Each structure stands twice: as C-alpha cells, then as structure tokens.
C-alpha cells in the first residue's frame, strides 16, 4: 500500500502557487478595485457639473445674504458684512409673512386643481380608443412643451382688457359688463388668470404620468374584481388606486416644488401687481433684490424661500412615509 503525504512548500515559487497564483491574484484584486471605482468615475463629470451649476450659486447667494450690498457698494466694489441683519429685517417685517402665507395658499390651490384635473384626464386616456388617445396626448404634449414666457404672453392676449378674446366671448354670451373688464386690476382676478395658466401647463405632466401608471395594472386584477361583484367605484379603489398611489405621491411632490417657485408666470403676467398684491416669494425676492437694488435683502429672502420649501417637502414626505407604514 502506498501512502502519499503533502509536501510543504519548499520555496517562493511554491508559496506563490499556494496563494492562488501570485501575480494573477494581484491582478484580479486590482481589477476588482478598478471595477468598484468605475461607477464613481462615470458619475464624477455629472457630479462636478451639478456642484458647479447649482452648488456655487447657492453658496454665492448664502454669502450675499450676510452682506449689505446695494448699488453703491456694487459700484465701489466694497464688501460690507452685516451678519444676520438682513434676516432680522426680513423676519421682523410684515411683508415677508404676508407673502409667505399667500405663497402657501397659492401653491395649495394650484396643486390640488392640477392633480384633480390631471388625474381625471389620465384616467380618461386609459379608456379612450387609440386614435382619440393619440390626438389628446398630442394636445397635452404641445401645451406642456410651450415655453413659459410664450404661454404667459398668449394668456396676456387672451385676457387683454380691450381686445382680449375672453372678454369678447363673455360679452357675446350676455355678460356685457365684462366687455371692458381688466383682469389685472384686482388681486383675485390676476390670481385667477395665473392659476388657469399654471394648471393648463401642469396638467399634461400629471395626466401622462398617471396614464403610464395605468398601463402597468394587469387586466387579470380587474377580471378578478368583476368576478367578486365589484362595481366601477370598488374596482377603482381596490385595484386602480393602490397602483397609482406611488405615482400620485411622486407627482404631487414635484408639483409642489414647481408651483411654489412659479416666478415666470406671476412676474411676466403682471409684475406682482396690482400694488404688489400678487407677489409670491420668488417674485418678492426678485423685486426686493433686483428691482429695489437691495441685493443682500433679496438673497436673504431667497435663502428663506429655499428653507420654507424644504420644510414643506419634508412635511409632505413625512406624511407619505407614515401612510406607507400604516398600509404595511
């Protein structure tokens, strides 16, 4: 009988063989490290561009908010650091809080209208035939793709006091008092037109997203609900709504951000008038900073606007997460 015993390594070459090939193992580890770093290297250009285009303006705005920077200091290239004086002046004034409440109400009304109208159109798209769905989606995409300034200009023409189409139609329908009505003459009428404009531009995004969400719902679930005797409303609440809920959360979150900072529509339509009664926070920051040449004050208002928006979104996300935990 022959007994074979394992011979211990006798030299460096045997040690390298026992370690798994020496150079081959080192190359494998190096390749593994390179593979782990590859995603970060690919993300580096995008991250650098984000920091350059978004991070630096935020830092610059934050620095300006601690300075007394008016036209005199700007011409003389003088930097006057004032600490939190700009924030104290803004927070102790009535205008900021009045504009803040107005901005929150304005955002809430527009978001609710946008989500309701967009949700109904999205559900309608799911039930239309192919041709009608295609035509409606073309119209939605065209409305969504129109530049904001161009859309605002069109609405200025539509609601013009003397030659506007809206006043002409209302006059022909019997409302003769509207023939020469000024839509920019009061706070309510101005906000009404701006709200119609914002909802008109925001609905396509909501409708198309919700329609896309309905295409992910299996038909078997509706068939099972019908076999259980569920009607249209029960099928919607038991089958459709649970699938749409994540899309509704995400879409609402985005709409809150976009509408809260709707500067172009409000400022282009009437410049925050009449008598600055339709100013929301972005318009208020621009008028104080650029219009009145109080650049430090405008920067402080902009920083506070960002903080308020972060607070609103954090509160909304907290509600969403709590609802998801309750469902689990």
From Swiss-Prot:
Major place of residence: membrane
Protein name listed in UniProt: Diacetylchitobiose uptake system permease protein DasB
Functional note: Part of the ABC transporter complex DasABC-MsiK involved in N,N'-diacetylchitobiose ((GlcNAc)2) uptake. Responsible for the translocation of the substrate across the membrane.
Record field: transmembrane: 36-56, 104-124, 134-154, 188-208, 247-267, 297-317
Keyword line: Cell membrane, Membrane, Sugar transport, Transmembrane, Transmembrane helix, Transport
GO CC annotation: plasma membrane
Ranges for domain ABC transmembrane type-1: 100-316
């Amino acid at each position: 009988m022959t007994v074979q015993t394992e011979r211990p390594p006798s030299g460096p070459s045997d040690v390298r063989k026992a370690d798994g090939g020496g150079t081959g193992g080192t190359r494998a580890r190096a390749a593994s490290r390179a593979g782990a770093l590859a995603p970060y290297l690919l993300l580096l250009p995008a991250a650098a561009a984000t920091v350059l285009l978004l991070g630096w303006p935020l830092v610059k705005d934050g620095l300006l908010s601690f300075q007394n920077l008016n036209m005199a200091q700007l011409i003389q290239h003088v930097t006057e650091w004032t600490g939190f004086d700009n924030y104290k002046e803004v927070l102790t004034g009535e205008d900021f809080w009045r504009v803040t409440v107005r901005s929150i109400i304005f955002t809430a009304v527009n978001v609710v209208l946008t989500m309701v109208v967009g949700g109904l159109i999205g559900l309608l798209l799911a039930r239309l035939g192919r041709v009608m769905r295609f035509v409606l989606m073309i119209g939605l995409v065209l409305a969504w793709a129109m530049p904001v300034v161009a859309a605002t200009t069109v609405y200025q023409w539509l609601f013009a006091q003397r030659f506007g189409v809206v006043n002409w139609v209302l006059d022909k329908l019997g409302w003769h008092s509207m023939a020469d009505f000024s839509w920019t003459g009061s706070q309510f009428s101005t906000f009404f037109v701006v709200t119609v404009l914002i909802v008109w531009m925001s609905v396509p995004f909501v409708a198309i997203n919700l329609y896309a969400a309905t295409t992910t719902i299996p038909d078997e679930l509706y068939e099972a609900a019908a076999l259980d005797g569920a009607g249209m409303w029960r099928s919607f609440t038991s089958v459709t709504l649970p699938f749409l809920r994540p899309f509704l959360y995400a879409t609402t979150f985005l709409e809150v951000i976009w509408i809260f900072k709707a500067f172009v529509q409000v400022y282009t339509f009437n410049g925050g008038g009449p008598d600055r009664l339709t100013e929301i926070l972005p318009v208020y920051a621009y008028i104080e900073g650029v219009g009145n040449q109080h650049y430090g004050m405008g920067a402080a208002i902009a920083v506070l606007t960002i903080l308020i928006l972060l607070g609103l979104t954090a509160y909304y996300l907290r509600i969403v997460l709590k609802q998801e935990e309750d469902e689990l």
